[in-house]
């Protein structure tokens, strides 16, 4: 099937969308979504807890259905699509990778903070030994300069990563910021590895940024049907396909079939639409990790403080994935200020 696309699309509704659903996917939902995406021609479908293998925990939120069961179901359901899984070193383990492979996952996507690529070296080595295709995620890519990001990508590629993604975890990058980073990675990696892009809609630029990435040389692009992802969601796959069709980028995905899948199958599994509301906008504007949204809203309700103010301060402090517990400290800080009569602004 590889001759069918200029760009390979990975749908991450069943991984990034897990954040929006608080990791409560059922087997029936996963089976139906995989079948619909597969029938539409989606080549890669990512399935795991929102925070990757081993993410079901007190800190990140517990899964309704064990992720390994969902990976196994997805692999058994898909006729053509390959099943990818995400893992974060320090959250997931090498044994988790082996189990995901045994359950039918064939693409291992390993994510680190954009300055910490070195923690992925052993995991890429294992994944290649297991015969898995490898993808690297450099998260929160807006926080460092393109040349520094490229140096981190080189670490992943040398470790065995076959495609390194510029990951706009906060939805904070704007067009040229995406193009500059993708171009830097393309120049650094050459033929050693492909470059990908994973965007969020927190500033409404998921699709536009993905187009900028492709024009800068990206060969793999992420999206989620109906924007089903953290924060305001990911670039909607159905819109991506429509735009790529218009500009002559082949994806192998049928526009009408993916539009039907998004409307008729994915949307019913969503607890609500992923909204570009005030909280999401502040996340994009302030550079906040998108998966913080649900955690911030929960702590804001618990302590009676504005979620928007909590998110803005999280951005000011440059919190990254894994530091969700610090939202409690910020909420308590804001509450003390409010109780003292101080004005709290964004």
UniProtKB/Swiss-Prot annotation:
Site (Transition state stabilizer): 15
Activity regulation field: Shows aldolase activity only when expressed and copurified with HsaG. This arrangement probably prevents the deleterious formation and release of toxic aldehydes in the absence of the partner dehydrogenase.
Cofactor mode of binding and number, as noted: Requires a divalent metal cation. Activity is highest in the presence of Mn(2+), followed by Co(2+) and Ni(2+). Mg(2+) and Ca(2+) are poor metal cofactors. No activity with Cd(2+), Zn(2+) or Cu(2+).
Binding site residues for substrate: 15-16, 169, 198, 289
Domain Pyruvate carboxyltransferase: 7-259
Catalytic residues identified in the record: 19
UniProt KW keywords: Aromatic hydrocarbons catabolism, Cobalt, Lyase, Manganese, Metal-binding, Nickel
InterPro entries in the record: 2-IPM_HCS-like, 4OH_2_O-val_aldolase, Aldolase_TIM, DmpG_comm, DRE_TIM_HOA, PYR_CT
Cofactor field: Mn(2+); Ni(2+); Co(2+)
One GO BP annotation of this record: catabolic process
Cellular component annotations (GO), alphabetically ordered: peptidoglycan-based cell wall
Catalytic activity field: (S)-4-hydroxy-2-oxohexanoate = propanal + pyruvate; (S)-4-hydroxy-2-oxopentanoate = acetaldehyde + pyruvate
Record-linked CDD domains: DRE_TIM_HOA
Function: Involved in cholesterol degradation. Catalyzes the retro-aldol cleavage of 4-hydroxy-2-oxohexanoate (HOHA) to pyruvate and propanal. Can also catalyze the cleavage of 4-hydroxy-2-oxopentanoate (HOPA) to pyruvate and acetaldehyde. The aldehydes produced by this reaction are directly channeled to the dehydrogenase HsaG.
Quaternary structure (record): Homodimer. Forms a heterotetramer composed of two aldolase (HsaF) and two dehydrogenase (HsaG) subunits.
Family annotation (PANTHER family): 2-ISOPROPYLMALATE SYNTHASE 1, CHLOROPLASTIC-RELATED, HOMOCITRATE SYNTHASE-RELATED
Family membership: Belongs to the 4-hydroxy-2-oxovalerate aldolase family.
Protein name per Swiss-Prot or TrEMBL: 4-hydroxy-2-oxohexanoate aldolase
Record organism: Mycobacterium tuberculosis (strain ATCC 25618 / H37Rv)
Gene field: hsaF
